[in-house]
Regions:
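Start-of-helix register in tetratricopeptide repeats
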Residues: 22, 58, 91-94, 127-130, ...
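Canonical tetratricopeptide repeat
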Residues: 26, 62, 98, 134, ...
Length: 176
C-alpha cells in the first residue's frame, strides 16, 4: 500500500510519471478495486500516455472496462479502440470483442460485425471463439441465419471448451 501512495504522489502530490507505466497501471487497478473511479481513470490514462508496449494496451483495455461499467460508453469505445489499434497479442483481441458488444448495444451492427471479425481474425485462443459465438448471435438476429450458422460452426470447430458448447446449442436452435 505504501508503494501505491508513493506512486499516487507521495508528500508532494505528484502524479505517477510517464516513465513508470507499470506503476501507473497497477495503481489504476488498485484504485479501481477500491472504488476510486476518478483516480483509476487518471492512473490508467498515465499508463496509456506512456506508449509502453505492454502497459499502455493493458491500461486502455482496463479503462474501457471501467468506463463501460460506469456508463461512459463513448469513452469505453475510445479506450477499446486504442487497445485494438495497439495490436497487442492479448489486449487487442479482447478489446475488439468488447468493442463489438458496445456497438451491438447501440444497434450499430456493421461496426459490431467488424469488431467481432477483428477479434476472430486475431486467432486469440479465447477471444476469437467467443467472438464467433457473439457474431453468430448478432447475425441470427440480423436475419442472416446462414452466416450465423457458419460463425457458430467455426466456434464449434475451434474446440474452445465453453464457446464451442454454447455455439453448438445455438447451432441446434437454428436447425430446429
Amino acid at each position: 500500500m505504501k508503494a501505491f501512495r508513493r506512486l499516487r504522489g507521495g508528500p508532494r502530490g505528484a502524479a505517477p510519471s510517464a516513465y513508470d507505466p507499470a506503476g501507473a497501471f497497477h495503481l489504476g487497478a488498485r484504485l479501481s478495486e477500491q472504488g476510486d473511479v476518478d483516480g483509476a481513470k487518471e492512473a490508467y490514462r498515465q499508463a496509456m500516455d506512456s506508449a509502453d508496449p505492454e502497459y499502455a494496451p493493458a491500461a486502455a483495455y482496463r479503462l474501457g472496462l471501467l468506463l463501460g461499467r460506469h456508463g461512459d460508453i463513448e469513452g469505453a469505445k475510445e479506450a477499446y479502440r486504442q487497445a485494438v489499434n495497439s495490436g497487442h497479442r492479448e489486449h487487442s483481441p479482447v478489446a475488439a470483442r468488447n468493442l463489438g458488444h458496445l456497438y451491438k448495444r447501440q444497434a450499430r451492427y456493421r461496426q459490431a460485425i467488424a469488431a467481432y471479425q477483428a477479434a476472430i481474425d486475431s486467432g486469440h485462443p479465447d477471444a476469437a471463439p467467443w467472438a464467433m459465438v457473439y457474431l453468430g448471435n448478432l447475425l441470427s438476429g440480423y436475419a442472416d441465419p446462414q452466416a450465423a450458422r457458419a460463425s457458430y460452426q467455426r466456434a464449434v470447430d475451434s474446440g474452445h471448451p465453453e464457446a464451442a458448447r454454447q455455439a453448438a446449442r445455438h447451432l441446434a436452435g437454428l436447425e430446429s
